[in-house]
Amino acid sequence: MQSLPFDLVTGLGFGAFLLLLLALPLAFWAVSSQARTGIVQLLVALANLLLTSQLVLRWWESGHFPISNLYESLCFLAWACTLTQLLVERSWPSPIVAAAATPMGLGCIAFASFALPDQLQSAAPLVPALRSSWLVMHVSVIMVSYAALLVGSLLSLAVLLTDRGEALELRSSSIGSGGFRQSMRVGSDGVLQLQSIRLSTGEQLDSLSYRTITVGFLMLTVGIVSGAVWANEAWGSYWSWDPKETWALICWLVYAAYLHTRLSRGWQGRRPALVAVVGLVVIAVCYIGVNLLGIGLHSYGWFLG
């Protein structure tokens, strides 16, 4: 493939970093002043556009889907996180969402741009094991699931920091109900009436985190299954207890426990939010920790000799 100037790809990432760096304090200012977040959404949307352009140019330059090393996967994760944030804000354009979610996209692109050595930022030919159509199916789905789970977990963290003295009363009937929950009351004529009660800030965040984590969990399941099929084709085994595989399974179990406590135990508010925050830590270990150790078949490699 024809080579692009390397600073063009990294420059787009740096531009996205600057936009998100500007958006973050504006988001926190909007929270404190209860201002609208239109400018923050615009900055995040522009950052997502730059990240999209960066990934497309990297794809054109390298000749393969740009998710083959730690730098590319971090840029892809930043893109997925900003996109998830924009989609969540369409459901509830609150400055709290922007303040909770923007740090994740900013952290990913900052780590990719400033923490990785130049060798890891360079495009390189795919190793034979990655020259498969499963690369897009498995890795991209896993990364998008991480983005949804990370954003959802950050919203759960926001639940822990808001409405701390108020009992949350979110019910399944309020999921996707436009910020209202349904409640029965007895009217003056003695007839039961259905009334809509606006959700509190904590309940809105709880609803959004639940929905976002549910989507992320389903995608993580698809990603793990597709990875097992690909592993069998490439290495002759569906599961080898590679460190990344093991931590991905732990991640799946944590979020399965989160959904179980909500669906079967009726937990809501702060208790499942604590489980989601544990999931946040597990994803960090699974994604970054394994690469820092530089071990396993799934490691992108941190040490280069």
UniProtKB/Swiss-Prot annotation:
Disulfide bonds: none
Keywords on record: Cytochrome c-type biogenesis, Membrane, Thylakoid, Transmembrane, Transmembrane helix
Annotated membrane topology: Multi-pass membrane protein
InterPro entries with a match to the protein in the record: Cyt_c_assembly, Cyt_c_biogenesis_CcsA, Cyt_c_biogenesis_CcsA/CcmC
Compartments it resides in: Cellular thylakoid membrane
Main location: membrane
Family membership: Belongs to the CcmF/CycK/Ccl1/NrfE/CcsA family.
Subunit and partners: May interact with ccs1.
Role summary: Required during biogenesis of c-type cytochromes (cytochrome c6 and cytochrome f) at the step of heme attachment.
PANTHER family: CYTOCHROME B_B6 PROTEIN-RELATED, HEME EXPORTER PROTEIN C
NCBIfam families: cytochr_II_ccsB
Protein's name according to its UniProt entry: Cytochrome c biogenesis protein CcsA
Organism per entry: Parasynechococcus marenigrum (strain WH8102)
